[in-house]
Amino acid sequence: FVSLHTLPAGTSRVPIEVFMAKFYKDKALENTYELPDWTKPLQVGAALTRERVARDTDFEGDNISAKNVNYCELTALYWLWKNRLQKEGAGGYYGLFHYRRILDLCDADVLRLEENGIDAVLSYPTLHEPDILEHHARYIKDADWEAMLRALRELQPEYYNALKHIGLQPYFYNYNMLIARHEVLKDYC
C-alpha cells in the first residue's frame, strides 16, 4: 500500500466533495475537530425522523433514506451516487466519511490526488482472523447474507466467484469510507 502522504504534492486543487454521514442518534464526540471546507455533513436516515443534525440530508432527491436501518451509511452513498455523481459535468473527487471516522488528509494531500493520478484513497485494511467470511458471519444475519449471495450470483456472477477468494482473506476495508475520482466512484456505485 502506498501512503498518500509520501507522494509529491501538486500545485492545483481539483474539486473535491466528501460527505460525512451523521445520524440523529450519534453520540456526542468528546473532542471536536475542524473539518476541511471540502467535507460536508450529510444526515442519514433523515426519512425516519423530523430531527435535523445537518443541512443536507439523504432524504432529498432520489434516495433510500427510509432503509437506513438496514443499510446504515450506504444510504449516503446511494444519495451521493444518484444526486451528485449523475450530474452533467460533475468531476473531481467525491467521498464518504462518518461523523467519528475520517481519513487523515490535509490540504497538501488533496493537492497530491490529481498530480499523482490517484483513483481512490482508502483507509488502511483491518485484519480479521481467520478470514472475512467468519467475521461477517458474526455480524450479518444468515438470511441477509444468503439474499446478498443470490443477488450477486444472478446480477454479477464474476463478482460472486471473486467473493469466494476474497472472503478467505484476513483483511478488508471497513466502514465504507473512501475518496475517489468521480468516474471511479460512479462505477463503484
Show which residues each predicted segment covers:
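ER/Golgi luminal nucleotide-sugar-dependent glycosyltransferases, focusing on the catalytic module
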Residues: 1-189
